[in-house]
Amino acid sequence: MNYGVALFPSKPLQDLANSYRMRYDPHYTLIPPHVTLKEPFELEEQELPSVVKRVREIAKGVDPFPLEVYKVDTFYPVSNTLFFKIREHSALTELYEQLHTSPFKRNEKYSFVPHLTIGQNLSYDELSDNLGRLKMKQIQHEEIVDRIQLLYQLDNGSWTVYETFKLGKEE
């Protein structure tokens, strides 16, 4: 089965992202807006308990942190994707790095660019038209992230939460 690790932002930020995703993201119905921390990876059922334990350990080792969206950007020419760019933060990078150490395989295709996808698989014309329009908008949002999620993929291609892990040491 396929698994992944992501963080889901607050409802206001998800609503803002979805206002674009419903039109520009063919994966809109498969998963809510999220920040991918670990690309999809395959696990056998007997491997799941040790992975859950490791994700829990990683989450406990990273304190809650600010998530700041500050502009719209694109991965063009690598891919015709539009996204809300997220300001880098050491805790976010730490989570990403830890989720790419043993027992996890390094399966990332690209270097880590914190972002929230709002459009993908766009034609060049769609990308350039929308990028120009969206760059004129003032996109500014900040919130505190205090949890991450282990997800699994259903047979229909959609993703659902397997378990949620609170960041930082429990008091």
UniProtKB/Swiss-Prot annotation:
A GO molecular-function annotation: hydrolase activity, acting on ester bonds
UniProt xrefs under Gene3D superfamilies: Cyclic phosphodiesterase (3.90.1140.10)
Record InterPro entries: 2H_phosphoesterase_YjcG-like (IPR050580), Cyclic_Pdiesterase (IPR009097), YjcG (IPR022932)
Keyword line: Hydrolase
Active site annotation, chain numbering: 34 (proton donor), 115 (proton acceptor)
Keyword Hydrolase (UniProt): yes
Chain ranges for the short sequence motif HXTX 2 as given in the UniProt record: 115-118
Top-level taxonomic group: Bacteria
Protein EC: 3.1.-.-
Motif extent (HXTX 1): 34-37
One Pfam family cited in the UniProt record for this chain: 2_5_RNA_ligase2
Entry-linked SUPFAM superfamilies: LigT-like
Keyword Chaperone: no
Cited PANTHER family: PHOSPHOESTERASE SAOUHSC_00951-RELATED, PHOSPHOESTERASE YJCG-RELATED
Family classification: Belongs to the 2H phosphoesterase superfamily. YjcG family.
Record-linked HAMAP family: 2H_phosphoesterase_YjcG
Name of the protein this chain belongs to: Putative phosphoesterase BH1439
Species of origin: Halalkalibacterium halodurans (strain ATCC BAA-125 / DSM 18197 / FERM 7344 / JCM 9153 / C-125) (Bacillus halodurans)
Taxonomic lineage of the native organism: Bacteria, Bacillati, Bacillota, Bacilli, Bacillales
